Amino acid sequence: MDKFDTQEKIMDLVKECAEFYQQGELLEAMACCDEIIKLDPTSVVGYYNQGIMLFEEEHFDLSNHCYDQIIKIDPKHIESWVKKGINLFMLEEYEESIVCFDEAIRIDPKDYLQWVNKGKSLYALQNFSECMTCYDKAIKINDKDANVLFLKSRLLYELGNYEESIQFCDKVICIESKDSHTWLIKGMSLLHLGKYEESIVCFDEIIGFEDVDHYSICGAWNEKGLAHRNLGNYEESIVCFDKVIEIDPNYENAWSNRGNSLRDIEKFEESVLSCDEAIKINPEFAGAWSNKGLSLHSLKKYEEAVSCYDKVIEIDPDFENIWYNKGWALDRLNRKKESQLCFDKVDQLNNEKTVNFVDSITGINSNN
């Protein structure tokens, strides 16, 4: 078969492959790719299509074998570097994925999406500083991509930069006014800033959207409940938490938060039951155990409260106020020595925080 006939046969196989693929007949489509590779081992199209299909079947390692073959043929085949990087990301091999995205960036520094992909891998590695740099690079190239702006707003939120997070949320909303995830981040940022009424406006936006995803609608009702609780609207907060539970009975945070609001209105027994529901869903939920302990404390069931606090300490010894709360419960039981040990632990933890703070300040000053 001469070169012309070979190319013509390859074109026919490419068409057949596409038809099989569209019909969901992946084995037949893969067989077409194998035929293409047999006809021309240097043909990129056979390996490339195979790589895509293997990716969709979640055979990420096998998919990467295809892209490695292409890279041997053409080291500057940017799509293969990108897809290899994505496969490695899916395999949680984040450092290796960054190598691939760096190679794609070297080939085309203005491909902003590869800065985004690199940023996502750095985010997964909790390298937030370099992740932010990547998002900034992407935004410098294209400041109209709502997804990149959202990723930066989310990272700013997680780093506690709430004011700046809101600014980027507003940029996203100017582009995509009904992006529920962005409204949720904006609302939570406002909540952290103590702007509870403004945060409720954001959560109500989400609640008013049609076809909202599960994460956003549950998050909106739950966070709205927290905002109402902070405003002292305890009954309204319970209505919100009930709405979350109606949508998703396994939403553990809503059960625990509901327990808090019930305690606020002195419905301590109901509060305990609500916390128990959260604990059934997640027995390692330290917050729910703590909330249950506080309600039992209010019911003067100090032994049971101590048991709850002990469970919290088992899960998270540094849980906020837990040693203090345990100390007071033990004090009520007239177990003074044990109580004092808890208060000593509070002092120790506070001193450690102070030392860490001083060390960080000293470190900053020494660099000046």
Predicted regions located by residue number:
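TPR/TPR-like (Sel1-like) alpha-helical repeat modules
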Residues: Y324-T354
